[in-house]
């Protein structure tokens, strides 16, 4: 699957003065850890299920991890970034049935909209953008291996009579399961049931065991599964197989929102451990905060969504939307309010007015300050404050660096993704 077109990202001068290490907070340990090794960096970020794209919660995730890609590249690392798109899954099929739109067309339309939004927000595209459908052969091979190793098993029909032969992972095969978070079994079961799991499925060896292969049902899409029979993949195994194929293990960062920490990342990590015999397939798990609106986390089920495309269509500069996001640390939960957009538009106008002054305080100091902020757990608010301070001083007539405006514009573009 083709990703969107990446923006042109300018190179900055004096790369030797750039921090050579970007540190992020690992969910598993709670500690800051270097991200990137031996001149290379690799990251997997979970992508959209394309049936309602792109709201500010999505944008928050992808803009946040875009900062990491930009910081890595500025530091001279060779970056491999992989993102999936879950282009077949129960929520997509349910939305298609409810609207009378073919599920393939719905997915294609929403993926195209997502791409337009990523282009508008100047998010750097991943090197590999992989759909669940195209990963089916890899999933089949992985599930067959797990069955052969007794790390998976088949179950009989569900209570509705369907699903005879569904394949589930035996989490008992992974002694490290649960090591990513700090949840007890009751908390895991509650979240598993809320987030797509089926703890009460008859025939399972344990309530938390996740689906690997859903055998063919009437009026559902399916694909050849070799010895598994026709069907479609489970959610967690899709990401595990895509990461294994396009990144290998271990890779540096597994990224996504905090709502993916459990069960999705915990279970994908478990599958990778079983398939690769690697204790820590991802060196660090990095999770972004949730965005709320009208008092609740933005969610498709609640319908309290603010769409990037609608903001842009109303005349909002996409760079102001990006600045709304950059005003918050990626790990922060925050609530969107209309006033935030006005503040972001004012900030954008101030930065542009500062560039028009012709000279100002040292641009090199801005580059160093923004780099230092991003190297410290992607501190976007700290980086934005550096630019705010420079802009205020430039407008006040301080400084005589004639090249400052051009230097700052390149830095803000390259590191923060904001085109001035």
Swiss-Prot record:
Q: Name one GO molecular function term.
A: zinc ion binding
Q: What is its EC number?
A: 6.3.1.13
Q: How is the cofactor bound?
A: Binds 1 zinc ion per subunit.
- EC top class named in words: ligase
Q: What domain of life is recorded for the organism?
A: Bacteria
User: Where would I look for the motif 'HIGH' region in this sequence?
Assistant: 48-58
Enumerate the residues binding L-cysteinyl-5'-AMP. 46-49, 61, 84-86, 235, 257-259, 291
- A Pfam match is tRNA-synt_1e
Output the Gene Ontology cellular-component terms: cytosol
Keywords from UniProt, A to Z, are:
ATP-binding, Ligase, Metal-binding, Nucleotide-binding, Zinc
Show where the record puts the motif 'KMSKS' region: 297-301
What InterPro entries does the record tag this protein with?
A: Cys-tRNA/MSH_ligase, Mycothiol_ligase_MshC, Rossmann-like_a/b/a_fold, tRNA-synt_1_cat_dom
Cofactor(s) annotated in UniProt: Zn(2+)
Catalysed transformations (reactions): 1D-myo-inositol 2-amino-2-deoxy-alpha-D-glucopyranoside + L-cysteine + ATP = 1D-myo-inositol 2-(L-cysteinylamino)-2-deoxy-alpha-D-glucopyranoside + AMP + diphosphate + H(+)
**Chain residues that bind Zn(2+):** 46, 239, 264
Q: Which residues cross the membrane?
A: none
The GO annotation for biological process reads: cysteinyl-tRNA aminoacylation; mycothiol biosynthetic process
Q: Motif 'ERGGDP' region residues?
A: 194-199
Q: Which PANTHER family match?
A: CYSTEINE--TRNA LIGASE, CYTOPLASMIC, CYSTEINYL-TRNA SYNTHETASE
Q: How does it assemble?
A: Monomer.
Q: Which family does it belong to?
A: Belongs to the class-I aminoacyl-tRNA synthetase family. MshC subfamily.
Q: Which HAMAP family match?
A: MshC
What this protein is reported to do is described as: Catalyzes the ATP-dependent condensation of GlcN-Ins and L-cysteine to form L-Cys-GlcN-Ins.
Q: What is this protein called?
A: L-cysteine:1D-myo-inositol 2-amino-2-deoxy-alpha-D-glucopyranoside ligase
> What organism is the protein native to?
Beutenbergia cavernae (strain ATCC BAA-8 / DSM 12333 / CCUG 43141 / JCM 11478 / NBRC 16432 / NCIMB 13614 / HKI 0122)
